[in-house]
Curated annotation (Swiss-Prot):
It comes from the Bacteria. GO terms for molecular function: metal ion binding; oxidoreductase activity. There is a cross-link at residues 71-162 (3-(O4'-tyrosyl)-valine (Val-Tyr)). Its cofactor is Fe cation; Mn(2+). It comes from Mycolicibacterium vanbaalenii (strain DSM 7251 / JCM 13017 / BCRC 16820 / KCTC 9966 / NRRL B-24157 / PYR-1) (Mycobacterium vanbaalenii). Binds 1 Fe cation per subunit. Its EC number is 1.-.-.-. Mn(2+) binds at residues 68, 101, 104. This is R2-like ligand binding oxidase. Belongs to the ribonucleoside diphosphate reductase small chain family. R2-like ligand binding oxidase subfamily. Homodimer. Probable oxidase that might be involved in lipid metabolism. InterPro entries: Ferritin-like_SF, R2LOX, RNR-like, RNR_small_fam.
């Protein structure tokens, strides 16, 4: 694509109050280095777990690291779509987004190495058909589509797939599982720190996805139907992934139940509809500086903290 001008030189400069650049500034302010996390106690805690507990937790970690790797590879077309749309602020934020996904891949791999898990883990995912469909089919297809079709509808479908369902349901449910494993037992402090750091990054990622869907719905109400349709296609698949995981175990460790996690995931998915629908008919200028997408993710985080504290 030939370049004819530089947006950063435009009169008035960049709108630092726009949500994408607010997220970008937030990521800069909260930068963290995986090498600074202390995993030294995690090895002893890991070895104190039963074989069943280690197997369940290894599968959970395998799902996370493979997901982080997938997004690191697949997010590039969204950057190109933002460039095609002339949205420098979004493109700047997505460069940070991609860097953070690569960093998340790094830190999960560092944790696996620290606790001594070096064998091939692909088999843990091969037993999860819904997971494989989501990450090996739905995610790359929806994001790759942006390379040839960067339209608002295609952006909404891609954002729903990753930001709303994969991050907004599946990943949040996985973080909840790690909290239940680690905090309830007072173990794996390195993993606790890892999850806290990643969760903070991904709240910004989800907020950007919500913002992107909101601005497209505000601009054209037809995109609301695109959002609804894609959510209704993928929510059952996300819930089926939880079923697949629990079905592999005659005995589930750590006192976890499928019903608890299904309810948690479904709640996070369904509450996203209201945030997107509230943008219908709104002026685009308002959407650009409306921070409700970030407030929603902060609300979810606060609810989790209170719930986990009450159950401790």
């Amino acid at each position: 694509m030939a370049r004819t001008r530089s947006d950063s030189l435009a009169a008035g400069g960049l709108n630092w109050d726009s949500l994408p650049l607010r997220l970008f500034a937030g990521g800069n302010a909260k930068f963290w280095d995986p090498a600074d996390i202390d995993f030294s106690r995690d090895r002893a805690d890991w070895e104190s777990l039963t074989d069943l507990e280690r197997d369940w937790a290894t599968r959970l970690c395998a799902e996370f690291i493979a997901g982080e790797e997938a997004v690191t590879q697949d997010i590039q077309p969204f950057m190109a779509a933002m460039r095609a749309e002339g949205r420098l602020g979004d493109e700047m934020y997505l460069t940070q987004f991609a860097f953070e996904e690569a960093k998340h891949t790094q830190v999960f791999r560092m944790w696996l190495d620290a606790v001594g898990i070096t064998e091939d883990l692909q088999g843990y995912l091969d037993e999860l058909p819904a997971y494989c469909q989501m990450f090996y089919e739905e995610l790359p297809a929806s994001l790759d589509a942006l390379a040839t079709d960067p339209s608002p509808a295609a952006q909404v479908r891609a954002s729903v797939t990753y930001n709303h369902v994969i991050e907004g349901m599946m990943a949040l449910t996985g973080y909840y599982a790690w909290h239940r494993i680690c905090v309830d037992r007072g173990i794996l402090p390195g993993m606790q720190e890892l999850v806290r750091r990643i969760g903070d990054d991904e709240r910004r990622h989800m907020a950007w996805g919500t913002f992107t869907c909101r601005r497209h719905v505000a601009a054209d109400d037809a995109n609301w139907a695109v959002f609804e349709t894609r959510m209704n296609e993928l929510i059952p698949l996300a819930l089926r992934n939880t079923e697949d995981g629990f079905a592999l175990y005659d005995e589930v460790p750590f006192g976890l139940t499928m019903e608890e996690f299904q309810q948690y995931a479904a709640d996070k998915g369904m509450r996203r509809f209201g945030t997107i629908s509230s943008a219908r008919g709104r002026p685009l200028a308002e959407i650009d500086v409306d921070y409700s997408p970030l407030h929603l993710e902060d609300t979810f985080a606060d609810e989790d903290r209170k719930s986990l504290a009450a159950s401790a």
